[in-house]
Amino acid sequence: MHPLIQEAIRITQDLGGVVFIGAVGILLQTKVTRESQDLDFAVAKELPAELLDEKQYFTRKIKGKEVRYTPRGYKIDIYTKDVSGIPIDKVIATAKDIEVKREVTVKAASVEVLVVSKFRAAAKRKGADDTDIRTLAQRKYKGIDWDLLKTLTMSEIEFLRIRNQMDALHRMQLRF
């Protein structure tokens, strides 16, 4: 089992109610891995520092910023308000339980949340987000609920841009 999935299981056991986004969300939804050094997840409400400390989730100052780690040394980013502008309540309400081994599930953001959040992130920076978008188009295109995805976008223009680019990526894949 992939080490990030093992860590996702441990985080879920430690903290409960977490929804994985980012590289781990993509891995859970598509079974495609890419290099990632951290685990990003959403929770319905702020996790008190005391709880995290009690569970031995520790912080380090890196370049003047507090960075949180699991007891096993994995860097984590915890989202409590939104994921790339998508409200946390929608991220959690649309999350999917993914079975990672017999009778063990971990929650991942829905494909629709991952698509919208990756498109928004890719607009701000170059890199892994483009790869993640291609992976989602290749592996999950046919299962996308376009009506749900539309409710996650901020405008008709954003929805059409995402839809058109996903359509094009899917068609390109069919040619190879």
Spell out what each predicted region is.
Residues M1-F176:
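Compositionally biased terminal segments of proteins
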